[in-house]
Amino acid sequence: MAAASTPPRAERKRXSWSRLPGAQRESAGLAKKCPFSLELAESGPPSSALYAPVSPPSAPEPAPPASPASPAPPAADQGPQPPVSLDPRVSIYSVRRPLLARTHIQGRVYNFLERPTGWKCFAYHFTVFLIVLVCLIFSVLSTIEQYATLATGTLFWMEIVLVVFFGTEYVVRLWSAGCRSKYVGLWGRLRFARKPISIIDLIVVVASMVVLCVGSKGQVFATSAIRGIRFLQILRMLHVDRQGGTWRLLGSVVFIHRQELITTLYIGFLGLIFSSYFVYLAEKDAVNESGRVEFGSYADALWWGVVTVTTIGYGDKVPQTWVGKTIASCFSVFAISFFALPAGILGSGFALKVQQKQRQKHFNRQIPAAASLIQTAWRCYAAENPDSATWKIYIRKPTRGHALLSPSPKPKKSAMVKKKKFKLDKDNGVSPGEKTLPVPQITCEPPEERRPDHFPVDSHDGSVRKSPALLEVSTPQFLRTNSFAEDLDLEGETLLAPITHVSQLREHHRATVKVIRRMQYFVAKKKFQQARKPYDVRDVIEQYSQGHLNLMVRIKELQRRLDQSIGKPSLFVPISEKSKDRGSNSIGARLNRVEDKVTQLDQRLVLIADMLQQLLALHQGRCHGGAHPAQARDGDPADPELFLPTYEQLTVPRRDPEEGS
């Protein structure tokens, strides 16, 4: 495969543009926004260039392709042409061996140095740590007279190697920081150099250069001034933790438990001051066996207090009198207990922080599983929607232009492309086990049409991308079963054309998509359930306690609604009855009382209805001119049945005459 030499950007763009047909120049404008140039690979002479033998379904009969050497007619006269068969992932790249971009190399170097992940990064940084540690050991040995001669000579050459190494690494770090948007340009590099860890690296390099330049006769740390700079080389140990994760963890623990630490330190400091002062008062005139006053000043007492309450106990100063010993013992028990508390607080804080990080990791695993479950559930729901937006993700986008076909790449290059894509996905944080849901592409049988004779089938088969998610729909081949079939001009193989519009989807396509979506939903549901499983007994206990708390809240809400509906017991239960029977205040007893009240109310309503019926019958009898039977019998116009019942008659039940007598 011949590839053109790398001309300037403008000339290469003009050459690519001139080789494109008129219908493709519009689509080639997308390459202007890409940092890579759009190049067409040519294999052999231009006459041997091949087009894809598949045409869009909307075209009834494709026009024969024009030679690249001939002038391209307008797009309207040329008619629709077959789409390009290049892989969309590499359509903007040259078919030659891909050249690594400058920004891509910067990004890989930056991630390798500043964001180490993987065993290669670990091996590199661990080796640097070992070299720095060995150099530090030789620096310590150079201060011992027994090993000074051997250590200083070896240390001199090690310092030269480390200065060159750290200086080169500092320059490479400064250069690779340009892949970040905030570190682009001169001011961006200065912003990167102002980082604390970058300042430490620069100080270490400069200090090492000063040590090597001032050292005489190959002897490092020869003068007293150079020995003072030796401390700066200890800062190389900070090179191991460039991200500052250790300091951030310590700072977060101290910030979270700042109140407890401040309280314990304050009380311990007060205990130290008072104990030192009282011991000084008791021991300021005491003389030891050698005739010397041990606590001659308050500063001596403070030194004794610090050594005692921190449980160091040098033994250089000891109380001599029994009063001083008693005061020292009492205050020591009190002060030591408070000075030991910060260690326990920090230890428990670190343990809680580690546990919190583990829970956060476990929770972060649930996020992609939950997102996949929501996505698949929505797709299952949307599969019943006949709108075109539901099915657009399964439609292959038609290319706007038409380009020349290139021979299939070698297996080695395709493997390199796959490996490169895997590395890019890994750098972007996408692990192989957490890939996004695949969207299958649907292909269908194209309409019967006349193919040009110079379109070989083998080249088409190699140009169509095969994937496990590709749904292929093919018709059975025609078999020559009799002599009449021999006269038919039949195709030996049925070609598959990608579906480019929703209207081309058939019913079996939609049914297949629904089945795939349902399967994806069940798989996502299973993964989400696995991610939701607790990984610790404490999580199980926490879930049970949270569930119990929610249950109690709901029970209280139900109790409040019942009190609002049927009333509280204190509203209709006398105080004397509350102490007699506790069970009468239960919900069942209250409901029984409500039912009794409803029954009494129903009886009253029945009585009122009977009285109203009697009044209605009396009124109807008067209207017809007839006398009321009771009036004819008694003749008493003041009969109470002739009038409406009073309030007492409705509320107080009537008594029988026998009971009244």
UniProtKB/Swiss-Prot annotation:
Family classification? Belongs to the potassium channel family. KQT (TC 1.A.1.15) subfamily. Kv7.1/KCNQ1 sub-subfamily.
A Pfam family found in this protein is Ion_trans
Q: Which portions of the sequence form the region Interaction with KCNE1 C-terminus?
A: 534-571
GO cellular component assignments: apical plasma membrane; basolateral plasma membrane; cytoplasm; cytoplasmic vesicle membrane; early endosome; endoplasmic reticulum; membrane raft; monoatomic ion channel complex
Q: Which organism is it from?
A: Oryctolagus cuniculus (Rabbit)
Q: Where is this region: C-terminal assembly domain (tetramerization)?
A: 588-619
Q: What is this protein called?
A: Potassium voltage-gated channel subfamily KQT member 1
* In-chain residues carrying the UniProt-annotated modification Phosphoserine: 27, 406, 408
